[in-house]
């Protein structure tokens, strides 16, 4: 009885893994000078490559495509490109606008052509307990990470964890994750104490139930991450404050910095020079901003104080960070007032904050701000007010129903003896009035415009 060799098997190419082999000298001479003996390798089929390399397979065509293109644009580079596009549109340079838009659409530095591939990779986003938006990492279940009930692999994993990774897991995890972990540990401990002499079948049943619960947790986390990603993406799409948003009212912008911009309000404000300082990057509160963005916002404040001081006027800066979970785009409102009113403003706000919300609160009602970012935890809703360049007050909002969104404007309107319609409802003003207010303040801002230095540095 003869047995057919493996080489003659019809399904041989689908089963056997073909490893790369060096080209022999006699074949290398026939192929040409571009093939070097013993260095150029012959690769197998796609299936054999996948079987041999697994998930780490790198194909030649992918390598060539990655070498031909540039590095992908970072978030900061995209923001800077959007700011340049806005400046070019304000100047009327259409050629530069088209060039920069092509570069932004391509998403690759040094490439002006948009990508030809229609496939799109989406990075899932999520919010941590401090309100920061992070890429959602693929969390594997315990059964995938440690094997099916393998306590030895679990111990090895815990040994390999250093302090930094443990701190990272602690920070990126949410309160709900910790509660679910605590509940599962209680259930597990109760099952262990149930019988001292458990049989092999009981242990197998427990491991089977654990595997089912792990799969259930994995599906639940995937659904939650997709839902949260869609909610965050929706807040980005609907935002009218982001510098690259199509809904941004560009005619209201006074000047654009590196990470922030100054604009007049689109509603009928408390004054014709009622302004807002807005970060170009989407962020729900100023305490989540980077150091350089925070410092840049201080530059706008110094310039505005100088402008209004020349008019013998004072100014009030306030921020209303409400519903941080909804991921709104934060901005600081700037309202000029008469010098006499500015001197009394701190007394009005101090009294109003002490009387707001209920009598019994978990947090201190009135916080005298020295460094706001170190005094209020991230992820909290709060109200903050500053008087000129001096420190002001802050208040942690515990009940949104008892703390109105018009808290600051109502106080300022009362000091200025303005009618209720000025602060009750912010109705969008006519575009002609918006443009008129913006053009008038541009003339006042020109002597202290620190963004001119940025333009001069970019032209050099």
Curated annotation (Swiss-Prot):
Gene Ontology, cellular component aspect: post-mRNA release spliceosomal complex
GO biological process, one term: mRNA splicing, via spliceosome
Coiled-coil parts of chain: 84-106, 210-231
Polar residues: compositionally biased ranges: 54-68
Chain intervals for the UniProt region annotation (Disordered): 38-78, 103-175, 193-227
Composition bias type Basic and acidic residues, residue spans: 113-131, 139-172, 205-227
Keyword Transmembrane helix: no
Domain of life: Eukaryota
Keyword list, A-Z: Coiled coil
Pfam entry (one): CwfJ_C_1
InterPro entries named among the record's database cross-references: Cwf19-like, Cwf19-like_C_dom-1, Cwf19-like_C_dom-2
PANTHER family referenced in this protein's UniProt entry, alphabetically: CWF19, CELL CYCLE CONTROL PROTEIN (PTHR12072), CWF19-LIKE PROTEIN 2 (PTHR12072:SF5)
Family, as annotated: Belongs to the CWF19 family.
Protein name in the entry: CWF19-like protein 2 homolog
UniProt gene name: cwf-19L2
């Amino acid at each position: 009885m003869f047995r057919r060799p493996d080489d003659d098997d019809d399904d041989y190419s689908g089963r056997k893994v073909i490893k790369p082999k060096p080209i022999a000298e006699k074949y290398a001479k026939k192929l040409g000078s571009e093939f070097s003996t013993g260095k150029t390798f012959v690769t197998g089929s796609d299936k054999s490559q996948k079987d041999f390399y697994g998930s780490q397979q790198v194909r030649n065509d992918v390598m060539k495509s990655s070498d031909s293109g540039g590095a992908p644009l970072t978030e900061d580079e995209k923001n800077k490109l959007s700011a340049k596009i806005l400046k070019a549109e304000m100047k009327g340079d259409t050629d530069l606008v088209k060039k920069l838009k092509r570069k932004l659409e391509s998403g690759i530095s040094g490439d002006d052509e948009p990508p030809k591939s229609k496939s799109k990779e989406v990075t899932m986003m999520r919010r941590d307990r401090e309100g920061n938006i992070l890429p959602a990492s693929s969390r594997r279940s315990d059964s995938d990470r440690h094997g099916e009930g393998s306590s030895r692999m679990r111990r090895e994993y815990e040994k390999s964890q250093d302090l930094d990774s443990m701190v990272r897991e602690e920070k990126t995890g949410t309160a709900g994750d910790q509660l679910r972990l605590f509940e599962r540990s209680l259930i597990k401990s109760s099952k262990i104490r149930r019988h001292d002499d458990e049989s092999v079948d009981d242990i197998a049943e427990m491991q089977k139930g654990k595997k089912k619960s792990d799969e259930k947790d994995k599906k639940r986390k995937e659904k939650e991450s997709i839902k949260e990603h869609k909610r965050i993406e929706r807040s980005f799409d609907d935002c009218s404050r982001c510098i690259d948003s199509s809904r941004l009212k560009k005619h209201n912008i006074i000047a654009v910095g590196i990470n922030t911009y100054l604009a007049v309000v689109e509603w009928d404000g408390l004054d014709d020079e009622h302004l807002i300082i807005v970060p170009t990057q989407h962020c729900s509160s100023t305490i989540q901003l980077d150091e350089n963005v925070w410092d840049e916002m201080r530059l706008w404040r110094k310039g505005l104080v100088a402008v209004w001081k020349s008019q013998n006027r004072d100014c009030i800066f306030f921020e209303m960070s409400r519903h941080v979970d909804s991921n709104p785009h934060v901005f600081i409102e700037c309202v000029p007032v008469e010098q006499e009113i500015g001197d009394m403003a701190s007394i009005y706000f101090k009294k109003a904050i002490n009387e707001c919300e209920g009598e019994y609160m978990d947090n201190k009602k009135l916080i005298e701000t020295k460094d706001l970012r170190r005094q209020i935890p991230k992820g909290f809703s709060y109200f903050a007010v500053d008087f000129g360049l001096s420190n002001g007050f802050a208040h942690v909002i515990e009940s949104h129903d008892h703390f109105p969104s018009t808290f600051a404007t109502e106080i300022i309107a009362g000091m200025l003896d303005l009618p209720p319609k000025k602060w009750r409802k912010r109705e969008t003003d006519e575009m002609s009035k918006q443009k008129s207010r913006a053009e008038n303040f541009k003339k006042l801002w020109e002597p202290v415009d620190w963004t001119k230095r940025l333009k001069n540095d970019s032209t050099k």
